[in-house]
Amino acid sequence: MAAKQNRISEALSSFIRAESFSGIFLFFCAVSAMIVANSPFSDIYKNFWEQPFGFSFAGGFYGFSIHDWINDVLMSIFFLMVGLEIKRELLFGDLSGFQKAAFPVIGAVGGMIVPGVIYYVLNMNTPSYHGFGIPMATDIAFALGVILLLGKRVPLALKVFLVTLAVADDLGAIVVIAVFYPSPEGLHFIYLGVAAGLLILLTGINHLGVRHLGVYIGIGILLWFCVHHSGIHATIAAVALAFCIPVKPKIESKEFIQVVQQMIEIFESKDKERKNILLDTQQMSAIDEAGRDFAKVQNPLLRLEHALQPLCAFIIMPLFAFANAGVDIRAEVNFHIDHIMLGVILGLVVGKPLGILSLTFLCEKCKIASRPAGVSWSHIFGAGMLAGIGFTMSMFVSNLAFDAPQASDVSKIAILLASSIAGIVGSLYLIINYKINSRAKVKS
């Protein structure tokens, strides 16, 4: 049990480091996109993403635009990692028990409902009402990047709370995408039926003890194809696949230790007989067998998650930011399209902290759950502000919510402004709060 807890702790630490540093890189890519989109290279930037990429066969073209490859295919890999994180947290982490999960989950619910309601109230009875999902999202990479820069000014318990809240927020965002943002062409039930059959197959091979990740990835690609053509956004297939990835390793730790000890004994016995630096056949076989067992003892879920983390953090998400954050503000952008601008900014900057603080406060007063030790209400409010950094996740929802370029551009500018305000104000608030608390401790 202790070894398992250590592995989960290491996974969480690795996750925080990767997400935090990638947040800085994401910011650089977003700024670069804005600079290029407002430079003489603006047309090249826009046209590049619309270039088709694929292959031709029998008179037909099979592929997508570069923009769609990033938003539909690469982002599915990102959502696969998100799904793995959610499953890990549900089974072993801070979402694994009611007492541990209740406080951050209720905070995440408040941080989604209040921003969504604010946006909807401002835009109801307008064509832009369906953008309510935009301010509901949180960009965990940016939020953790900011909280990392604050260092010791923020207690570790608050970092864990923010990570857990963001994971729960991701789960909520996935539900919102699946339910409220289907394809405008409607649902295709034949593809949905095949997708359901593939999900049953994935669940079945998991229960049968199949641990080879290649099998799951292969079936997952077919699942992605069916969901993509069904009318539901393809990233949902990636999340469903993540929940089917096995947790148990092929061999247990005790068996692995016995095998390794046997290999070491063989290696040592043959080493005494060796007359030169070359390994003999039995020693080479022992090394090969030990190598195979190293893979077998690894948890498939954690192994895949660790493999995807750097890919998502330093390639996929920066690419997404660079491809989607470039809005030409020199053009005639109609900032008065309904109340998109106001809805997104108020939702993220005001709605997020208000929703998180109010629902967690009620949660504690009703004795459903309590705050983590060492975390004050001022900390919760500060974390709520940082949760208002929607950025990439909000932009992803914006792409689904708006087909009209004008509405999409306004929402993206609003997301960038709101995320900047939330990050700056949240950071200053937590710094000032730390200084006030430090002075109070000195006086006492």
UniProtKB/Swiss-Prot annotation:
InterPro entries assigned to the protein according to its UniProt record, in alphabetical order: Na/H_antiporter_dom_sf, NhaA
GO BP annotation list: regulation of pH
Recorded topology in the membrane: Multi-pass membrane protein
Location (main, coarse): membrane
Protein location: Cell inner membrane
Pfam families the UniProt entry points to: Na_H_antiport_1 (PF06965)
Record's keyword terms, sorted: Antiport, Cell inner membrane, Cell membrane, Ion transport, Membrane, Sodium, Sodium transport, Transmembrane, Transmembrane helix, Transport
Catalysed reactions, semicolon-separated: Na(+)(in) + 2 H(+)(out) = Na(+)(out) + 2 H(+)(in)
Gene Ontology MF term list: sodium:proton antiporter activity
Membrane-spanning parts: 21-41, 64-84, 102-122, 131-151, 160-180, 185-205, 212-232, 307-327, 342-362, 377-397, 413-433
Gene Ontology CC, one term: plasma membrane
Family the UniProt entry places it in: Belongs to the NhaA Na(+)/H(+) (TC 2.A.33) antiporter family.
Function, as annotated: Na(+)/H(+) antiporter that extrudes sodium in exchange for external protons.
NCBIfam families in UniProt: NhaA (TIGR00773), PRK14856.1 (NF011428)
Protein name per its UniProtKB record: Na(+)/H(+) antiporter NhaA 2
Organism: Helicobacter hepaticus (strain ATCC 51449 / 3B1)
Taxonomic lineage from the root: Bacteria, Pseudomonadati, Campylobacterota, Epsilonproteobacteria, Campylobacterales
